[in-house]
Amino acid sequence: MRIVLQKVSEGSVDVVDETSGEVDTTFEPQHIGIGYVLLVGVEDTDGAKQIDWLAHKIANLRVFEDENGKMNRSIHDVDGSVLSISQFTLYADVRKGNRPSFVKAGAPDHAEQVWHAFNDALRAQGLDVKEGRFGAHMRVSLTNDGPVTIIFDTDELGI
């Protein structure tokens, strides 16, 4: 799995109807205050091991400032929330040509299952998790705090 974590003071997502270009009213826009916006990419080899490790690490990561201005508080400590966005483009391969290849991204059925399982694992860690819509054209807005952006790649981490 590949995750781009951004510490935010707020974040939101809505879905755009690809035919009309208008906001899709069948999707209730999601909004969080302080917390994380997670861009989540899945590959076919991802499963429970990657899900569990990432959910635990993200839930306990200390990147929020304490009273001394040090990154020493977790998302739990600040009563933060998570906005999780599926994003297969994190597996773009741009080595050849000018159009990215996404062959390393997980098959849609598998990726959707893993993404939902990951969101559930975050909830099991006690986090409030809002979601975009898998496979949809979304508009994601966020206000970075810091900025703090951390990239997790379970392949590179050997997980």
UniProtKB/Swiss-Prot annotation:
- What EC number(s) has UniProt assigned to this enzyme? 3.1.1.96
Gene Ontology, cellular component aspect: cytoplasm
Listed A to Z, the keywords are: Cytoplasm, Hydrolase, RNA-binding, tRNA-binding
User: Is Cytoplasm given among the entry's keywords?
Assistant: yes
Motif interval(s): Gly-cisPro motif, important for rejection of L-amino acids: 146-147
Please cite one Gene Ontology biological process associated with this protein: D-amino acid catabolic process
> Does Cytoplasm show up as a keyword for this record?
yes
Localization per record: Cytoplasm
Under catalytic activity, the entry for this protein gives: glycyl-tRNA(Ala) + H2O = tRNA(Ala) + glycine + H(+); a D-aminoacyl-tRNA + H2O = a tRNA + a D-alpha-amino acid + H(+)
Note the Pfam families from the entry: Tyr_Deacylase
Main location class: cytoplasm
This entry's Gene Ontology molecular function terms read: D-tyrosyl-tRNA(Tyr) deacylase activity; Gly-tRNA(Ala) deacylase activity; Ser(Gly)-tRNA(Ala) hydrolase activity; tRNA binding
Q: What role is this protein assigned?
A: An aminoacyl-tRNA editing enzyme that deacylates mischarged D-aminoacyl-tRNAs. Also deacylates mischarged glycyl-tRNA(Ala), protecting cells against glycine mischarging by AlaRS. Acts via tRNA-based rather than protein-based catalysis; rejects L-amino acids rather than detecting D-amino acids in the active site. By recycling D-aminoacyl-tRNA to D-amino acids and free tRNA molecules, this enzyme counteracts the toxicity associated with the formation of D-aminoacyl-tRNA entities in vivo and helps enforce protein L-homochirality.
The record's similarity note reads: Belongs to the DTD family.
Per UniProt, subunit arrangement is: Homodimer.
Tell me the domain comment: A Gly-cisPro motif from one monomer fits into the active site of the other monomer to allow specific chiral rejection of L-amino acids.
Name assigned to this protein? D-aminoacyl-tRNA deacylase
Species whose genome carries this gene: Bifidobacterium adolescentis (strain ATCC 15703 / DSM 20083 / NCTC 11814 / E194a)
